[in-house]
């Protein structure tokens, strides 16, 4: 099967590319060749925003499936849809749970009315526009709305930050009195869902994807410490009226949870990676790939303000 994956150089798109190569598919990655490419892929060297170049690059190539990871606007989607020669049997857009307004009833279901989310701003509204544009061209396309993705190849300084704190045997600083729960999904489980969609074409075309349940931030931090050295973190509360949360903690002060009932009906339960196992996989990757994570100055802020 010929599969086109937009991106292919970092985290979600790179993991997807390597996942489907390992499954024996012919994987084409569309990117500007600014990074070393994964083994086994066919590079389509192009800036997707340059429509003429995109047309020329895709000319003469037919795809059975498209996994669009790097579409952030309606224009991104439209250019790709117009440049594809022959309609693929399956087009999957990786959207985001940022399409749901923060004040909507939770857990967010696929039928929740999408709209502005003040936490995510333009990112969320642009994703809504991308979804709508795709459905204009491909009414039977699939749209996936994940929460926080984590796991191997995660270049964002989220679990990696907590791993680093655990390695240094540091206490952990949490927003004071926070009861926030976070919703996660392991990158390999995302690939399992994509594979299922390509192979089985389920009836549900817009899917929330995520773990069966969210997790309290303190429990999430404790699991990160556990997979590093089996230690239990010492927690300190931080008054967020005095210190901006994002100065010392890798998530916004925002709790949300997705209803993933529809996803659970099609996901092979035996393949579902639990949080501790997923964090262990992430840490094993991180130990040998620290330079691939975009670190933030959280530890510097902590050292200067909380010691």
Model-derived regions: residue spans:
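N-terminal Rossmann NAD(P)H-binding glycine-rich loop of SDR-like oxidoreductase domains
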Residues: 3-23
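NAD(P)H-binding glycine-rich loop region in Rossmannoid oxidoreductase-like domains
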Residues: 34-37, 42-87, 99-100
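Conserved Rossmann-fold NAD(P)-dependent oxidoreductase catalytic core, especially the SDR/UDP-sugar
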Residues: 79-126, 134-136, 142
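Conserved beta-loop-beta element that borders a ligand/cofactor-binding pocket
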Residues: 131-153
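Alpha-helical substrate-binding/gating segment
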Residues: 163-173, 180-215, 222-225
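Mid/C-terminal beta-alpha module of Rossmann-like enzyme folds, strongest
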Residues: 197-254, 260, 299, 306
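Conserved C-terminal active-site "lid" loop/helix of NAD(P)H-dependent oxidoreductases
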Residues: 242-270, 280, 289-291
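Amphipathic terminal alpha-helices
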Residues: 275-307
């Amino acid at each position: 099967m010929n599969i086109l994956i937009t991106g292919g150089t970092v985290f979600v798109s790179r993991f997807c590319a390597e996942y489907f190569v390992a499954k024996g598919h012919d994987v084409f990655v569309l990117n500007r060749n600014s990074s070393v490419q994964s083994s086994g892929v066919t590079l389509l060297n192009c800036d997707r925003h340059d429509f003429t170049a995109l047309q020329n690059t895709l000319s003469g190539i037919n795809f059975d499936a498209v996994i669009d990871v790097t579409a952030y606007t309606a224009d991104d989607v439209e250019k790709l849809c117009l440049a594809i020669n022959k309609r693929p049997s399956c087009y999957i857009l990786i959207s985001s749970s940022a399409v749901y307004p923060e004040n909507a009833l939770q857990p967010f279901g696929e039928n929740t009315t999408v709209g502005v989310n003040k936490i995510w701003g333009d990112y969320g509204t642009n994703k809504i526009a991308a979804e709508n544009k795709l459905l204009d061209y491909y009414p039977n396309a699939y749209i996936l709305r994940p929460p926080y993705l984590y796991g191997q190849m995660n270049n964002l300084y989220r679990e990696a930050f907590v791993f680093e704190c655990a390695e240094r045997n540091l206490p952990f600083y949490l927003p004071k009195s926070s009861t926030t729960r976070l919703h996660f999904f392991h990158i390999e489980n995302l690939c399992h869902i994509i594979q299922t969609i390509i192979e089985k074409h389920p009836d549900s075309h817009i899917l929330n994807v995520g773990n069966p349940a969210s997790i309290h931030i303190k429990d999430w931090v404790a699991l990160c410490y556990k997979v590093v050295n089996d230690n239990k973190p010492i927690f300190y509360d931080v008054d967020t009226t005095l210190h901006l949360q994002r100065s010392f903690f890798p998530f916004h002060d925002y709790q949300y949870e997705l209803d993933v009932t529809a996803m659970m009906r099609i996901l092979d339960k035996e393949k579902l990676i639990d949080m501790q196992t997923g964090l262990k996989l992430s840490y094993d990757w991180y130990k040998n790939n620290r330079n691939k994570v975009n670190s933030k100055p959280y530890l510097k802020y902590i050292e200067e303000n909380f010691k």
